[in-house]
Design a protein with these regions (language model features):
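Substrate-binding surface in catalytic domains of secreted glycosidases
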Residues: 140-147, 203-303
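Active-site groove signature of glycoside hydrolases
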Residues: 132-135, 181-209, 234-237, 245-250, ...
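Glycan-binding loop/region signatures in secreted carbohydrate-active enzymes
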Residues: 273-276, 281-336, 364-384
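Hydrophobic faces of well-ordered beta-strands that scaffold small-molecule active sites
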Residues: 108-112, 131-133, 163-167, 196-198, ...
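Short, acidic/polar
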Residues: 112-127, 175-190, 233-239, 328-341
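Active-site-adjacent "subsite" loops/lids of carbohydrate-active enzymes
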Residues: 170-191, 247, 310-320, 324
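Glycan-recognition patch characteristic of GH18 chitinases/ENGases
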Residues: 98-183, 375-376, 380
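Primarily a LysM-type cell-wall glycan-binding module
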Residues: 1-23, 45-72
Length: 385
């Protein structure tokens, strides 16, 4: 038995204190796991309760660092679970509480867009294998940096996270024949990246031309210790064979049944072990999309009562100004992550700034994050064993 994961639905009259006492946890842990800043909770809101249930009695030579390494814990998790530990030295006869990961190892690919907050970046690094900076573009005049990432690259490397550069294509003629492969590789190496991410759809190019381009690009990258991540779009799945990894994009607004069916269908016809499944970051506000965190926080501030649609996996409420707002529930994300595990995907991909901390905490309670540029395929294939 590992961590007890409970998804609690808030009832009328419940407060953080009441809920914390009910599950034998603290208000501080509830706030941290659910990104709660004020006192307001929405009736019908789902809260994540994580309670470590295993203990380990340290040996004489054990330190906090060695125990963290042994059980795959980050500092925040270790010290949060064990308030009696103040530094690297472990008190005598203290039982260390830890969290096993029932789904085993997986990789994560977090996207860093312009405007991502430093605090959010620092918090998310604990859970990342790769960080993809959406920071460069192919233009008619060459490669252009959209924003500076030099400091963030250093921070990522210190945390053992591989930095990757996402290169947009903003040329007037998007044929792959006119791409200078050496310039792409030189740009990645000069800036300190460990890999390159490209959209696999190139307007005006035949699939055979794109495949030939990817073969030549990958050959140049391997000689420079770089990896290639392909971002799929319509009709480009077969091109993933030419990449080290690829991203199966989210269809924002799809219900849980549609998500599960799409992921299963992909796994049955493609190589899931080298594929990241993108996680949702948007809900719906009327006919428009709205970030899930904003949808949830609006409900808290306005003290709206949330309705749960178990068939779709969405929570919803009627906002006074914008009408119906709906967004994926914690149950949706838990089930989506179970699907990722069941069909043997490499891991998940998500927008660092937009992916709710609640969702990330569910992921981290289920998977151990790989921290290496060289994927440990044996660890992935034996996931959960």
């Amino acid at each position: 038995m590992g961590t007890k994961m409970i998804i609690h639905t808030v009832s009328d009259g419940e407060t953080l204190k009441i809920i914390a006492e009910k599950y034998g946890t603290s208000e501080e842990r509830l706030r941290e796991h659910n990104e709660i800043e004020g006192e307001s909770l929405s009736v019908g809101e789902q809260l994540l309760i994580l309670i470590p249930t295993r203990t380990y009695y340290p040996k004489p030579r054990d330190s906090a660092e060695s125990v963290m390494a042994r059980f795959g814990m980050c500092e925040r998790e270790f010290y949060g679970n064990n308030p009696g530990v103040r530094d690297s030295r472990l008190p005598k006869d203290l039982a260390i509480r830890y969290t096993p990961h029932p789904y085993g190892a997986a990789a994560t690919n977090g996207y860093f867009y312009k405007g991502t907050s430093p605090e959010r970046f620092a918090d998310t690094l604990l859970h990342l294998t790769y960080v993809t900076f959406a920071s460069s573009a192919l233009c008619d005049s060459g490669i252009k940096e959209l924003f500076d990432t030099s400091e963030e690259i250093k921070i990522a490397k210190r945390a053992g996270v591989v930095p990757i550069v996402k290169i947009f294509d903003k040329r007037s003629d998007r044929s792959v024949k006119k791409i200078n492969i050496d310039s792409i590789v030189d740009h990645a190496k000069k800036c300190g990246y460990g890999g390159i991410s490209l959209d696999l759809a190139y307007t005006g190019s035949e699939p055979s031309e794109i495949a030939e381009f990817l073969v030549e690009l990958r050959r140049a990258m391997i000689g420079n210790d770089l990896i290639l991540i392909g971002e799929m779009s319509g009709g480009s799945e077969e091109l993933c064979d030419y990449c080290d990894g690829c991203v199966l994009p989210i269809c924002e607004g799809e219900n849980l049944g549609e998500f599960t069916s799409r992921v299963k269908d992909y796994a049955e016809r493609s190589e899931s072990i080298k594929t990241f499944v993108e996680m949702p970051v948007f809900g719906k506000a009327g006919e428009a999309f709205i970030p899930i965190k904003e949808a949830r926080d609006r409900a808290r501030r306005g003290k709206y009562r949330l309705d749960s649609d178990k068939s779709s996996g969405f929570l919803s409420y009627d906002h006074k100004r914008v009408g119906k707002i709906s967004f994926p529930s914690l149950e949706y994300i838990k089930a989506a992550l179970a699907t990722v595990n069941e069909y043997g995907f490499m891991g998940i991909s998500f927008d660092i700034n937009g992916f709710p901390g609640q969702f990330l905490n569910i992921y981290y309670s289920l998977f151990k994050t790989l921290k290496s540029i060289t994927r440990t395929y044996s660890e992935l294939y034996n996931r959960g064993s």
